[in-house]
A protein has these predicted regions:
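N-terminal cysteine/histidine-rich coordination modules
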Residues: 1-100
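A near-ubiquitous, low-amplitude feature marking generic local secondary-structure context
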Residues: 5-9, 13, 56-60, 119, ...
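Short, Lys/Arg-enriched charge-dense amphipathic segments
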Residues: 57-63, 110-113, 179-183
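Amphipathic alpha-helical interaction segments
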Residues: 81-88, 174-177, 194
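Amphipathic alpha-helical repeat scaffolds of TPR domains
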Residues: 100-149, 154-179, 208-219
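Long C-terminal interaction/binding lobes of large macromolecular proteins
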Residues: 186-189, 196, 200-219
Length: 219
């Protein structure tokens, strides 16, 4: 059994480390399972949007498309993120400021039942190294919703930008699957959000990234 965010090699894939956390948002005792990619195990490439795609494994390592399994999801309240620092590693760990926002916590917990219903029994797949395409989309939708709500409640532009990058990663996954039309629809959603962020951003770096994105999408 893993504790305190400690690492263990996944028995199915030597390139993946298993971790367990707890959820800051709902405080459930239920373990939050997460996968971590071992460094230098995959040949990776960044596209023009800065999104990493995993092309092949390095010699002597198992292949994994880490984008498909990188979202960490609490099985109780379904709070989801790619950021492991938003999950509790030890009992004594202080809750990150962004997660102490009562407005966010209340809104998130209030809608848990609907969120579970929309997941439609896919939770088990989120713990798998081979989730279905539908389960991958659901996990990203949960992470996008989490980042968007955190961004609005805390007026945090970096969280709002994370929702944009998650949409672009989802587009990359769909492109690799050959679903060009679906990929383009995610890119369009990312462009709309980036446009909106650029108009309202006070954060210089976020504003710069948001301004560049529509240019890249137009290439």
């Amino acid at each position: 059994s893993l504790s305190g965010g400690s690492l263990a090699v996944n028995p199915e894939n030597s390139s993946i480390l298993n971790r367990e956390f707890n959820c800051f948002v709902c405080g459930s005792k239920q373990k939050v399972k997460a996968f971590q990619l071992k460094p230098h195990t995959q040949e990776a490439n960044r596209n023009i949007f800065g999104i990493t795609s995993y092309l092949a494994s390095m010699e002597g390592h198992d292949y994994i498309d880490f984008n498909k399994i990188r979202i960490i999801t609490c099985p109780t309240c379904l709070f989801s993120s790619i950021n492991k620092d938003l999950f509790r590693k030890t009992e004594r760990e202080k809750t990150p400021d962004i997660l102490t926002n009562q407005k966010f916590r209340t809104a998130w917990i209030k809608d848990v039942k609907n969120r579970h219903a929309s997941l439609a029994g896919k939770m088990k797949e989120l713990d798998s190294l081979n989730p279905s395409g539908e389960a991958v989309i659901k996990s990203y939708e949960l992470a996008i919703q989490s980042a968007s709500m955190l961004g609005v409640a805390n007026n945090d532009e970096s969280q709002k930008w994370q929702a944009v990058t998650l949409l672009m990663t989802l587009a990359e996954i769909q492109m690799n699957n050959g679903d060009v039309e679906v990929a383009e629809s995610y890119l369009e959603k990312a462009r709309e959000r980036a446009d909106n962020l650029f108009k309202n951003a006070g954060h210089a770096i976020v504003s710069f990234k948001a301004a560049r994105l529509p240019l890249f999408i137009g290439l």
